[in-house]
Amino acid sequence: MSYENFIGKQEKFTENINEKQVQKIVATLQSKQLKNGDALPYLWQWCFFNEALTPDKLGRDGHPKLGLDKNSFFPSFGEVNRMWAGGRFNFIAPLIIGEDATKITTIKKIQEKQGKSGKLTFVTLEHCYYQKEQLKIEEEQDILYKQPAPPKLTSDVVAMNADYSEKMQPDSTLLFRYSALTFNGHKIHYDFPYATQVEGYHSLVIHGPLLATYMINCFVKNHPDKQIINYSYRGMHALCVPDSFAVESKIIDNNTAEVWINKNGFVAHSGTIHFK
């Protein structure tokens, strides 16, 4: 199928980086207190710029329906499951709390592949974040749409020895609160019967962007003097509550660090950070 008419389509969102919303993120992630005028921490922009759709515009999984009408941003890919596969960031300057910001989203690429479980459709979105007409953050997000199949829950990539390691065990309350912060209706994060009986997970699924946030936070907490220039990350398999895991990091050279989620000695999610 040709998706040529969708390539280059754009959406624009303008929102205040509201201090009250920031305080909710602080409470959820147990982070340090922040106020108006402070820099928004890395990846917290995901808790802003999220479209408020009415229930009739949502699909069976709680995500926006695809190809709803001729004006839809996304085409229809049929009866598919959605996964946040990974992404890349260039950090030019931080967003500032208390100021208005604009996000412009562009469909950059739609690519079909054949996988072991059937057809895979990869969508790459570009998100550009601005304040006072200055580009602050460039992001590329990879979304995977796949035919219903048992989810991958293991990895054969052995975790390396880490410089820093922090044990974590998210619970369902944390998942619910993060879903609320990001206005994410995906049922795999809060609807146990749907997650287990429809999509085949053994429990509620931990958000990919939350895990990406944990990984970058691991580096920031242990290297607060370093400025991150860019960050790439990807998920290798899903993690569910109440699974415990370690968030780990290791500096590889003068301006590169690897970060990952260690689940029983194997890598579940991974990322690369370039810093100065």
Label the predicted regions.
Residues 1-100:
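Hydrophobic, proline/glycine-rich low-complexity stretches
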Residues 43-48, 64-75, 124, 148-164, ...:
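Charged, low-complexity, helix/coiled-coil-prone segments
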Residues 5, 16, 45-48, 81-83, ...:
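Residue-level preference for alpha-helix termini and adjacent loops
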Residues 1-10, 84-170, 238-276:
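HotDog/MaoC-like acyl-thioester-processing domains
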Residues 31-38, 131-134, 225-226, 253-254:
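Short, glycine- and charge-enriched coil/turn segments that flank and shape catalytic ligand pockets
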Residues 2-42, 156-211, 218-221:
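A contiguous, surface-exposed recognition patch within enzymatic or periplasmic domains that forms
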Residues 195-252, 258-272:
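Catalytic-pocket segment enriched in acidic/His residues
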